[in-house]
Amino acid sequence: MSEIHSSNAHFVEKYKDVLYFSSFFVPLTSNLWQLHIMRTKGEYIEMLRKHMSVLKQQFGIRSMCIFGSVARDEQGSDSDVDVCVEMEPDIYVLVALKQFLEKLFGCSVDVVRRHRNMNKLLEEQIERDALYVF
């Protein structure tokens, strides 16, 4: 837990359950994506579905999809995974989610929270590419 955000005691105290669970559940090194194994979109979706109860209960995610190069089968060995979620607007939970997914996948992850005022071009791209996990 201390490696995640040791300088911010408020963050750690407020989200200790999520951070502890994340660290315990997927105990991998923080820079594991250097050893990134390229996966298919189906493999990423399967991994997320296996962790669906964790994602819903620990992070409060109502829906989740993958978009971008992975969803279009255009990813390369250095690609990140783009994930869009519907959840309450909480930056600390969003950061913890990003860290959880990066440890789970072993690569860089970009997390976008869907909301009413989001950039329309981004929203259109997400809808065009979206592969819904739940």
Briefly describe each language-model feature range.
Residues 1-2, 131:
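Accessible peptide chain termini
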Residues 2-11:
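Extreme N-terminal basic, low-complexity initiation segments
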Residues 10-63, 71-77, 87-134:
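Catalytic core of pol beta-like nucleotidyltransferases
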Residues 65, 82-84:
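Short, well-ordered beta-strand segments
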